[in-house]
Amino acid sequence: MVVTNKYVLKWVEEMAALTKPDKIVWLDGSLEEKKKLEDECVASGEMIELNQDILPGCFYHRTAANDVARVEDRTFICSKTKEEAGPTNNWMDPAEMYAKLTPLFDGSMKGRTMYVLPYIMGPAGSPLSKVGVELTDSRYVVLNMRIMTRMGDIAWKQLGDDSEFVKGLHSKADIDADKRYIAHFPQDYTIWSINSGYGGNVILAKKCFALRIASVLAKEQDWMAEHMLILGIENEATGKTQYVTGAFPSACGKTNLAMLIPPAYAKGYKVFTVGDDIAWMRPFPDGHLYAINPENGFFGVAPGTSMESNPNALLTTKSNTIFTNVALTDDKNVWWKGMGVPAPAHMIDWLGKEWNKGDDEKAAAHPNSRFTAPASQCPSISPEWENPQGVPVSAILFGGRRAKTAPLVYQSFDWNHGVFVGATMASETTAAAAGAVGVVRRDPMAMKPFIGYNAGDYFAHWLHMGTLIEKKPLIFNVNWFKTDAEGKFMWPGYGDNFRVLEWVLKRCNNEVDARKTPIGYVPYAKDIDLTGLEGYTEADIENLLTIEKDVWEEEIAGIEKHFAGFDRLPAELENQLQAMKDRFAAV
C-alpha cells in the first residue's frame, strides 16, 4: 500500500537524510516479505535456519558478546527538565542528547537498507491501541518486531493521516558499547537507539514504547501502562472467567504464573494467558478497569524454561520462533541449561565456540538468552486476548522474593494502601546455602527501570486512577519465596500457586473472610486449599502466613530509606507508612 501520511513521509525523509542508507524499504507485513528477509539473513550469516523437521519456521541468532542485555546506564529519559525525569532515571537535556546522537547517526546506515516498519501496540481497532513506526537497519529487528507487534499495512490503515504515532529510530552502527545510547524523548514521542543489536534495546515497541513512552501518555490521558502479566481464570461450574494482573521483578516467576497449569485437584478450572509482560489498562464506562496486552508475542528468557517449569512457554516456541544466544546442537536444534533435556556431547555455544560434554553447562547459552515467539501459538492463550475492549480486571498482584518478611499472600486494606504496597515492593538476593538474607532491591510496581517520568508523579498517578475507577480491582501482595531456618523454600510454587489465586478470587467474590493484621488482610490457613498437596498441613500454611513484628520493623526502616530517595513523594504514601507504624505499635 502507498503511504500518504505527510507526517510519516517528512520524518522518514529527514531520518534518511541523516543516516544515509543505500535504499529504503517500506514494509507491508506480508508472508512473502518475511520469507525474503529470512533468506537474506541466512545468506548473510545474521541468522541460522534451525532443523525444520524439529523446529519449523525457527531461526537462530547470536548478538555481539558485548551486547546481551538491556543497558540501564546507557538508557536516558530526555524530558525538558531533570525534575520531570526524577530520581529513577538517567536524564539528559533533549537538545544536548540530540546534539550528541546526531553525529553518531550521521551516515550510520551507509551501505545498508533502512526498513520502515509500521506497527500497532494492542489489538487492531482497540480504543486502547497505539501506532508506532520504527526505522531500523537490522533485519533481525524487523523479524522480531513481526512477532512482537501487529505490523505492516494494518498499521498504516489504523494510523491514516494522523500525526500521533511513536517514532523510533534504530541503527546498529558498529555495536560500539561506549557509544551505545537508548534515548527517550517523551515530549516528542520519540526513541533513538544506537550501537546495539540486542532485543530490549532495539525492539523499540517493547520496554521503550510500551512502558517508558506509554507511561507518559497514560499519565496525560488517564490510563495505565504497567509491567504486568494478565491471566484469566475460568470456573466451569459458574461459567465465569475473572482476570488478574500481576507485577513482579525479574526472577520471580512472572511468565510461569501467566502460563500456569492448575494442579490436579482444581478440576473445572482453566487458566488462560492474556499477556506475560505488559498491561495497558483503562477505566471503562461500566466502572471496571479493562486491560489489554499491547504485545503480539513473548520475548522470554530461555534458561530454566522446561516442560516441568513452564510447558506452555516451551510449547509456544516449537515453531515460528527466533532463538537468540542459546546453544546450537549439531542437528540444528537449540539447548539451554534447565531445559529438562541432557546436554548433547557437542554443541556450539552462544559465542560461536565449540562446547564439549564436561564444559560448564551454564555457559553454553547466555543467562539472558531469549526466545521470540508468537503469542497466538501459546496453548494457554486466552480466547479474549485480542478483544479490542480488553478484559475486566478483578485483582492486581504485586510480588517479590522475600525470605522472611512478606507472608504467602495478603490483601491491601483499600486502593491507596495497595498503591503503598506496590510502591514499596522489593526483592532480595538470598545465599541459599546459608539462608542468609542478601541485598533488598526496591522495585516499585516492578517499574523502576521503565517509568518514563518522575516516580513520585507516577505514584500520584496511581492514586489519581483510584478516583476514576468505580469498581476498583482488589490489590494483593504474594510471596512464593519464603524460606525456613535452613533456607529451604516453604511453598512449592509453580502450579500450586493456583491455590493462592483461588483464595484471591474468593476474596474478590466476597466468599471468604480474612484476618486483619498491621500489613493487610491475611488468609485463615484453612482457606488455602491443600487438596492433593502431599506433606503440607494447615500448620505449614500458618507458618507461611506469620507476620513477625521485629522483621517488619526492619522493613519499615527500609521503606523510610526508600521513600527518602523520592523528591515528589505523595503525602498519602507518607500517611500510609505512618498508619502502618501505628498499627504495629498497637500490637
Question: What is the role of each PLM region?
Answer:
Residues 1-252, 262-587:
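Conserved internal helical-beta-strand scaffold that buttresses enzyme catalytic cores
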Residues 257:
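Hydrophobic positions on the alpha1 helix immediately C-terminal to the Walker A/P-loop
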